[in-house]
């Protein structure tokens, strides 16, 4: 089977989307399928092309068996103007058409959304190749844009995105969703049961695992012998990480505790300013690390935290970081409702509090820090849940079965 994967981000970039896709493409290649990835030059999240890829218009490389076709496009960081971001999204479309065309005839086109714009060349390439189209929803656009206040429902940009969304759903042979709530939403938008499939998020349990608390990578940070409350991932708008900073302020009396936010994103400068304004000395920031080093950083955490803004749309999502925390045997305190809260409860690996409630988050964190036994029990339960239900290997095998089903229908067998 020949499969074309289309994504604006891909390894060696870091983030939820590359972390979801890379194990999927690796699994397909290891099982004898020809996998092509049409993408751009790696630049996420800073918008600066990585050093080894600069000065090139097109390049072809192999990553764990997958043939990665990269074309240069206009790149920009997330914290610049919306016009610059839109230009970046739009410039990717001819780039991915170029890369996708070079892949030659394929049996299936697998495109991830968001961003939603690559669905346009994906639809065209699927038609040109006579291939089946699988649309993979790891978030919902334009719902997320409205949820974080970046645009108003009914505005001209959102109307355009809604039109692309409708075309994408009509054109897809299968729509895969990371959560049940997403599947329910697309059902309401006319995607029939025969098209909908659940392809949830998870973690690479061989990479994200329990490691020695004291290790050379974690030792690069000035934690000392303090207990560490850690957030690891994108410092984005939808995460409402001001709540984590406020929780740190409520625990400033604990000299044995430090909060650590590891990652980059459009809210980092604002969060650092918040820490300065509050005069906090118990909050540290750290930038991106290669994905293979992240579990060693997480190993130093005593409690992991996450949060999402209190919005009905965001109740439908579960961040990849939640599964990575659990896989590393870390107890989780999440400012989460809906799907995220359900995962914490179902796994037994965490405590859900109301999004944006810094007092509740601080109380839950304090309780776990004061109970090593509870932390250990939650850590073991969380790891067990991910291994049994949300391993990337299990999810990749599910995708392989789905592709076989779809392409066999295509071939009339």
Role assignments for model-derived ranges:
Residues 1-64, 411:
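N-terminal subdomain of nucleotide-sugar transferases
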Residues 97, 117-120, 124-129, 155-177:
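Membrane-proximal helix-turn-helix segments that form the acceptor-binding/catalytic region
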Residues 181, 202:
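Carbohydrate-associated surface elements
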Residues 187, 193-194, 203-219, 240:
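Acidic anion/phosphate-binding donor-loop and adjacent secondary structure
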Residues 223-248, 260:
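Conserved donor-binding/catalytic core segment of Leloir-type glycosyltransferases
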Residues 255, 268-295:
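Nucleotide-activated donor-binding/catalytic signature segment of Leloir-type glycosyltransferases, i.e.
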Residues 303-306, 324-335:
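Short hydrophobic beta-strand element within catalytic cores of glycosyltransferases
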């Amino acid at each position: 089977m020949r499969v074309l994967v289309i994504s604006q981000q891909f390894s060696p970039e870091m983030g939820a989307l590359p972390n979801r896709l890379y194990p999927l493409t690796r699994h397909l290649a290891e099982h004898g399928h020809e996998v092509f990835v049409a993408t751009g030059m790696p630049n996420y999240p800073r918008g600066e092309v990585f050093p080894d890829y600069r000065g090139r218009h097109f390049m072809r490389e192999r990553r764990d068996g997958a043939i990665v076709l990269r074309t240069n496009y206009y790149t920009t960081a997330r914290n610049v103007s919306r016009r610059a971001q839109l230009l970046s999204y739009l410039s990717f479309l001819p780039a991915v058409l170029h890369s996708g065309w070079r892949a030659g005839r394929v049996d299936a086109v697998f495109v991830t959304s968001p961003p939603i714009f690559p669905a346009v060349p994906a639809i065209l390439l699927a038609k040109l190749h006579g291939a089946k189209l699988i649309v993979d929803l790891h978030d919902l656009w334009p719902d997320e844009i409205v949820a974080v206040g970046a645009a108003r429902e009914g505005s001209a940009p959102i109307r355009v995105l809604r039109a692309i969304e409708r075309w994408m759903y009509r054109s897809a042979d299968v729509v895969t969703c990371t959560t049940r709530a997403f599947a329910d939403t697309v059902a309401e938008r006319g995607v029939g049961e025969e098209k909908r499939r659940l392809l949830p998020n998870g973690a690479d349990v061989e990479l994200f695992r329990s490691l020695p608390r004291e290790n050379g990578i974690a030792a690069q940070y000035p934690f000392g012998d303090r207990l560490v409350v850690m957030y690891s991932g994108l410092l984005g708008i939808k995460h409402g990480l001001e709540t984590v900073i406020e929780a740190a302020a409520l625990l400033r009396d604990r000299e044995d505790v430090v909060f650590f936010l590891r990652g980059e994103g459009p809210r980092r400068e604002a969060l650092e300013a918040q820490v300065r304004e509050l005069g906090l000395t118990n909050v540290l920031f750290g930038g991106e690390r290669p994905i293979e080093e992240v579990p060693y950083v997480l190993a130093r955490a005593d409690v992991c935290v996450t949060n999402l803004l209190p919005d009905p749309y965001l109740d439908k999502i579960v961040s990849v970081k939640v599964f990575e925390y659990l896989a590393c045997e870390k107890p989780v305190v999440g400012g989460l409702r809906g799907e995220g809260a359900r995962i914490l409860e179902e796994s037994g690996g965490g405590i859900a509090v109301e999004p944006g409630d810094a007092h509740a988050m601080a109380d839950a964190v304090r309780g776990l820090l004061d109970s090593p036994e509870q932390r250990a029990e939650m850590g073991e339960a969380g790891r067990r849940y991910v291994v049994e239900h949300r391993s990337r290997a299990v999810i990749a095998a599910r995708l392989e079965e789905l592709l076989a089903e779809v392409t066999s229908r295509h071939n009339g067998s």
